[in-house]
């Protein structure tokens, strides 16, 4: 199997002893197609291989190309302004989505994750014009710091696109406990965001 997403475990053969967990989650992913799967969480102490499992699940699902589009996002441990977080989350999702639809893995590591015009142009180039509307909407919300609108648009982006295109998108949010470190408000007066983990589906 080719590996679209670089796995931090190192060489792929270093991923061992996870057959039972992989089998469980691969069945869970397959059951998404029949709407039998529900949101779930992987809970374990640090350095127990949660990230390795999710990265491997992404790669398997990406190359299996069997009706489920994978999206993997790692929440950073450092504090992040909500607008910056939303932009990073959105760009990561859209680039991964385009990579899956086009089978072009280079889009998983874009050179620029801040240029909305370039992102929109790429969507058009790849025949995914339906993405330009939501890209423009998020760009407007970022520019004018419409935080509530931005948060809702970005949080719902995978679900919105999946619904409109009659597709299935699997969201894998790694280190979601760090969502509590996201901060809102303007850059002069920052307050911690509370109870906003609804971005995890």
Describe each model-derived feature in a short phrase.
Residues 11-15, 144, 189:
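Short, N-terminal intrinsically disordered low-complexity segments that are rich in Pro/Gly
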Residues 38-40, 44-188:
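P-loop NTPase nucleotide-binding core
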Residues 157-162, 191-201:
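Substrate-engagement module of ASCE P-loop NTPases
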């Amino acid at each position: 199997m080719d590996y679209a997403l670089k796995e931090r475990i190192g060489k792929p053969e270093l991923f061992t002893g996870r057959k039972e967990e992989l089998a469980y989650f691969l069945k869970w992913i397959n059951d998404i197609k029949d709407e039998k799967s529900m949101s779930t969480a992987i809970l374990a102490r640090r350095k127990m291989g949660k990230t390795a499992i999710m990265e491997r699940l992404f790669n398997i699902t990406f190359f299996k190309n069997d009706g489920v589009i994978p999206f993997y996002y790692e929440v950073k441990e450092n504090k992040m302004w909500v607008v910056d977080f939303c932009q990073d989350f959105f760009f990561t999702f859209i680039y991964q989505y385009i990579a899956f639809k086009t089978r072009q893995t280079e889009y998983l590591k874009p050179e620029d994750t801040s240029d909305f015009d370039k992102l929109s142009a790429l969507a058009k180039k790849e025949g995914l014009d339906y993405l330009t509307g939501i890209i423009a909407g998020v760009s407007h919300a970022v520019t004018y710091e419409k935080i509530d609108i931005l948060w809702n648009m970005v949080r719902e982006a995978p679900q919105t696109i999946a619904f409109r295109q009659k597709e299935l998108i699997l969201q894998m949010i790694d280190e979601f406990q760090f969502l509590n470190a996201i901060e809102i408000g303007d850059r002069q007066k920052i307050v911690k965001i509370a109870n906003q983990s609804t971005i995890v589906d």
